[in-house]
Amino acid sequence: MFANIGWGEMLVLVVVGLVVLGPERLPGAIRWSSGALRQARDYLSGVTSQLRDDMGPEFDDLRGQLGELQKLRGMTPRAALTKHLLDGDDSIFTGNFDKAASATPAVDAVASAQEAPDEPVRPPFDSDAT
């Protein structure tokens, strides 16, 4: 919950508390807030253990499904496309195509189909164009 608060933010909170509450009431306010946080944490851990007891093995299944949902929420659109539509092959995005050997016969087949004819082919005559 407070994992993102660093020492700098904590120092700012203490200074603001010192200015607002004064030096005589600040220790009591700190004790009260730490006690309230401790009670909230104990309450939440009690609720979690009660849910685990009531639901049994379904609780672990629910936590697994919620974990998968959290992984999907953290995916970027590119990662979602790569995983679900392209089966993890991201060469379309990176440009690293490893199957260059299979592309060369197709190029040769196209080149043989487009060989020059024996006689030159003239475009049809259009009387309106002249």
Curated annotation (Swiss-Prot):
Mode of membrane association: Single-pass membrane protein
Localization: Cell membrane
Recorded GO MF terms: protein transmembrane transporter activity
TM regions (residue ranges): 2-22
Pfam family, one: TatA_B_E
Keywords tagged on the record: Cell membrane, Membrane, Protein transport, Translocation, Transmembrane, Transmembrane helix, Transport
One term under GO cellular component: TAT protein transport complex
UniProt record, GO biological process: protein transport by the Tat complex
Signal peptide stretch: none
Residues covered by region (Disordered): 108-130
Its biological purpose: Part of the twin-arginine translocation (Tat) system that transports large folded proteins containing a characteristic twin-arginine motif in their signal peptide across membranes. Together with TatC, TatB is part of a receptor directly interacting with Tat signal peptides. TatB may form an oligomeric binding site that transiently accommodates folded Tat precursor proteins before their translocation.
Cross-referenced NCBIfam families: tatB
Family note: Belongs to the TatB family.
Subunit and partners: The Tat system comprises two distinct complexes: a TatABC complex, containing multiple copies of TatA, TatB and TatC subunits, and a separate TatA complex, containing only TatA subunits. Substrates initially bind to the TatABC complex, which probably triggers association of the separate TatA complex to form the active translocon.
Protein name per Swiss-Prot or TrEMBL: Sec-independent protein translocase protein TatB
Gene name in the database record: tatB
